[in-house]
């Protein structure tokens, strides 16, 4: 926030123009590699599937023998079509001024931001007006008005088992003109569900263009505060702020993809009130005793209401505007619902007492009592004390001999508690939802009335405040007149009674219930250092660095020593279904799966009478892991493993790898993180860089796991990541141009002499150590070059200051991670798709459908008149 200064009127402008594009996309198969993979996979599914692929792409001696011709075809990567180079601009004007009694500041800002995804953009207009009026010598009035409105278009919220329309765009067929010369509709049955990979209507560009997704919001906040200095140092202050907000969102499908126009209209309104009253008394007793006392009260209130209209089946002539205007005319289905939130009320009382002795010993104690209507009456109040002590050791007389090299040395110690009620207001008692007048209800007396059902969460009247206990020991230091300065923090934070949605027995009729779940802790060290390396004349060189070591732990788990849960990205196509786990005493968000041992080689089998028979001592795998795993081999009865199949460790040494061999694969969050900055100044030029890094973390690469599985019929015709070309192969193309199964052991061994990955034909995604990759990285986050024009150039045009700058972000990343970006966190606090505020267990460091990170180039100006 900015406050007006006394004096002449000041006008300043800050603005920039920004160009951004995606920094990296997934490398995919060449056209011929794509053909061979899908031809082979279709053959493994059956002759009907193989014939459809051959007919569509013109393969084999039966359909034109065009396999070799695809070596000269350039693969079309549709990711390049759905992403673009985007232009954004941001402007802010500030006008301030006033007299000794009245100070005013006005700010107007505008942002227009194109998204790197086609048909997406965001714009925001904001204005604020602040005035401070001295009503009397001891009486001040502060008034603040803020208005904001924003529009968001093209939000990417369409996801499925393969990701989003953006992250999954690469899967669409990369060949624009298949050489078979037939329409996809002629072979659709042979592609089964995979027809979407070649269907013109599922072209990623068409999918995005088919959807109009807009949201609009605006808010107005006004506040007024009165401060009265009753006696010297004793100030009473009372502040009241009111907020009013409204929102509208629309979702429209044009029907190009599924032939059925659909629309959803949401409206919402909300009101908020905040009242804060404080008494603050600062006084001294003698020269060496300084006191500060504060007493206060805060009241928070919020209410909201919303409505939703959903329809399906509109005339083909209806466009977006017509459909939204006549949304109630849906012919296939229609529903309308209204909801009113349970009002949220919070009342707090707090106090603080600070005491400083001789400007060397500092004591602070605070206490809060918070009451929230989000909990049942017996649990509404939480009490949170805190205390801190600091010692300016460098000011002690016995440290006088260090003054020439020690500028500052301060020790700090603190202990405190804080509470959180970050949940909805309706979780402690049963609430009901309207089914809407348009739903398929049974009429009563020939009419549809109002129908209600319980909300989707099981009520819990025992909910109480989530509490965090913070413990900290710190050292602030400075050397050589503070040319070297920094701090060292040692911390231990514990959070107990976490408010989380926990799965419950389905026999209750519910899926989840919010509970106070367990206790977690974070222990760590943070070191920050700043060094003025050179500060001479016109040149200055400064270095800053931050290092953090953090270790999290699940200290307590209710009712069990471990708890399994799922990331849900693949639903039933994920093995094991629960791919994350809590283990008491271990880190949070452990990944669970199988230990990969590569793939079964030809040498793991005896080739007897045309059959690949597992050698003694080599464990088999069960179909419970792979589901359908297609291959062309003849196997003994009861055997699942074959050359090229994914191979996992038999942890329990039962002789067969099954679901009992799923184990903890380790933690994913990095323990070591940090950043460092290099800053240069020479005369009017400035150059700064900021690097971020992590070490020791893992990324759960679900995106790669999807590429390594067949996904049954859904996978036919899908493009894959380029590394799939190095996977095990069981088919080859002969001299006549026909595909054949390679069953001879010697030929199979030679064909796969350089294979790096297992045969990607199994139906389910199998979580294994193969998909936990090193997520360490070093990133140049920002690079800025600035120039401040000399003042003698500006005086004639009545300009006080002009600074021009160029900034680039995300210029490069050094990492061994094979995915698009190692800095991922899909669903860090839980799965989406249930309830908007459902805080389920965290699926940390999971790379699935991650929106691509942008690289930006910005030119800006800071001007003061």
Q: For the regions a protein language model found, what residue spans apply to each?
A:
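Membrane-proximal, glycine/serine-rich, low-complexity loop/turn segments characteristic
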Residues: 2-219, 225-227, 290-291, 422-441, ...
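Conserved small-residue
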Residues: 12-69, 308-312, 427, 515, ...
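Extracytoplasmic gating/loop element in the C-terminal half of outer-membrane beta-barrel translocons
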Residues: 51, 65-66, 79, 372, ...
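Extracellular/periplasmic, surface-exposed regions of secreted and cell-surface proteins
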Residues: 60, 86-89, 124, 130-139, ...
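Flexible, solvent-exposed loop segments that connect beta-strands
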Residues: 70-71, 258-260
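Short, glycine-rich nucleotide/cofactor-binding loops
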Residues: 214, 664-669
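Segments forming glycine/polar-rich beta-alpha architectures that bind adenosine-containing cofactors
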Residues: 652, 668, 686, 690
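Conserved SET/PR-domain catalytic core that frames the SAM/AdoMet-binding pocket
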Residues: 660, 670-684, 781-786, 790
């Amino acid at each position: 926030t900015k406050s007006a200064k006394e004096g002449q009127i000041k006008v300043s402008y800050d603005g920039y123009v920004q160009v951004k594009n995606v920094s990296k996309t997934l490398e995919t198969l060449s056209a011929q590699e794509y053909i061979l993979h899908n031809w082979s996979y279709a053959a493994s599914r059956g002759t009907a599937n193989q014939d459809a692929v051959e007919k569509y792409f013109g393969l084999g001696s039966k359909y034109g023998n065009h396999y070799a011709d695809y070596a000269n075809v350039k693969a079309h990567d549709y990711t390049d079509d759905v992403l673009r180079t985007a232009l954004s601009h941001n402007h802010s004007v500030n006008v301030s001024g006033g007299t000794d009694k009245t100070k005013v500041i006005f700010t107007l800002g505008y942002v227009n931001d194109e998204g790197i995804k086609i048909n997406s953009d965001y714009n925001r207009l904001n204005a604020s007006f602040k005035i401070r009026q001295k009503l009397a010598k001891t009486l001040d009035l502060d008034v603040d008005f803020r208005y904001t409105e924003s529009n968001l278009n093209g939000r990417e919220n369409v996801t499925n088992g393969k990701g989003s329309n953006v992250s999954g765009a690469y899967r669409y067929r990369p060949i624009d003109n298949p050489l078979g010369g037939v329409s996809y509709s002629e072979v659709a049955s042979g592609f089964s569900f995979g027809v979407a990979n070649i269907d013109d209507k599922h072209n990623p560009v068409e999918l995005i263009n088919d959807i109009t997704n807009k949201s609009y919001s605006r808010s107005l906040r006004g506040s007024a505060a009165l401060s009265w200095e009753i006696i010297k140092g004793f100030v009473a202050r009372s502040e009241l702020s009111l907020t009013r907000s409204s929102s509208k969102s629309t979702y429209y499908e044009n029907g190009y993809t599924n032939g059925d126009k659909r629309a959803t209209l949401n409206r919402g309104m909300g009101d908020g009130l905040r009242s804060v009253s404080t008494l603050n008394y600062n006084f001294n007793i003698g020269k060496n005793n300084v006191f500060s006392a504060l007493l206060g009260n805060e009241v928070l209130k919020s209410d909201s209401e919303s409505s939703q209209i959903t329809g399906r089946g509109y005339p083909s002539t209806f466009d977006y505007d017509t459909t939204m205007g006549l949304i109630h005319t849906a012919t296939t289905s229609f529903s309308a619902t209204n909801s009113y939130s349970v009002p949220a009320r919070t009342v707090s009382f707090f106090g603080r007492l600070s005491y400083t002795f001789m400007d060397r010993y500092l004591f602070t104690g605070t206490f809060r009592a918070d009451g929230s209507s989000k909990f049942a009456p017996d649990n509404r109040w939480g009490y949170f004390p805190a205390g801190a002590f600091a010692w300016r050791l460098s000011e002690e007389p016995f440290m006088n001999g260090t003054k020439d090299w020690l500028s500052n040395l301060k020790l700090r110690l603190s202990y405190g508690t804080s509470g959180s009620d970050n949940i909805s207001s309706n979780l402690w008692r049963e609430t009901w939802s309207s089914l809407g007048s348009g739903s398929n209800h049974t009429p009563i007396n020939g009419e549809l009335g109002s129908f209600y059902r319980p909300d989707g969460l099981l009520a819990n009247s025992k909910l109480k405040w989530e509490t965090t206990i913070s413990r900290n020991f710190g050292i602030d230091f400075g050397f050589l007149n503070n040319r070297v300065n920094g701090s060292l923090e040692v911390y231990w934070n514990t959070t107990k009674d976490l408010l989380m949605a926990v799965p419950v027995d389905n026999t209750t009729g519910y899926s989840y219930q919010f509970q106070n779940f367990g206790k977690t802790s974070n222990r760590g060290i943070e070191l920050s250092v700043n060094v003025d390396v050179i500060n001479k004349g016109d040149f200055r060189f400064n270095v800053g660095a931050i290092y953090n070591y953090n270790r999290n732990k699940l200290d307590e788990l209710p009712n069990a020593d471990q708890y399994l849960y799922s990331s849900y990205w693949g639903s039933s196509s994920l093995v094991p279904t629960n791919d994350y786990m809590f283990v008491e005493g271990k880190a949070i968000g452990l990944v669970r799966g199988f230990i990969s041992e590569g793939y079964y080689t030809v040498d793991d089998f005896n080739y007897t009478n045309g059959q690949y028979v597992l050698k003694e001592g080599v464990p088999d795998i069960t179909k419970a892991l792979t589901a359908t795993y297609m291959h062309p081999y003849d196997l003994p009865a009861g055997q699942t493993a074959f050359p090229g199949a994914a191979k996992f460790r038999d942890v329990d040494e039962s002789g067969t790898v099954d679901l009992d061999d799923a184990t903890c694969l380790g933690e994913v969050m990095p323990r070591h993180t940090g950043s460092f900055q290099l800053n240069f100044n020479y005369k009017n030029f400035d150059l700064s860089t900021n690097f971020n890094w992590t070490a020791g973390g893992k990324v759960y690469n679900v995106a790669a796991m999807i590429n390594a599985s067949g996904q049954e019929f859904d996978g036919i015709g899908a493009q894959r990541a380029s590394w799939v070309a190095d996977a095990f192969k069981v088919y080859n193309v002969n001299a006549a141009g026909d595909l054949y199964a390679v069953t001879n052991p010697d030929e199979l061994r030679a064909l796969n002499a350089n294979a790096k990955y297992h045969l990607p034909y199994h139906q389910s995604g199998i979580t294994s150590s193969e998909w936990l990759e090193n997520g360490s990285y070093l990133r140049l986050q920002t690079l800025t070059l600035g120039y401040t024009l000399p003042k003698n150039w500006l005086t004639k045009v009545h300009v006080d200051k002009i600074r021009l700058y160029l900034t680039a972000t995300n210029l490069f990343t050094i990492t061994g991670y094979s995915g698009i970006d190692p800095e991922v966190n899909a669903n860090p606090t839980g799965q989406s798709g249930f309830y908007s505020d459902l805080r389920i267990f965290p699926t940390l460091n999971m790379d699935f459908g991650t929106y691509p990170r942008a690289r930006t180039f910005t030119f800006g100006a800071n001007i003061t008149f």
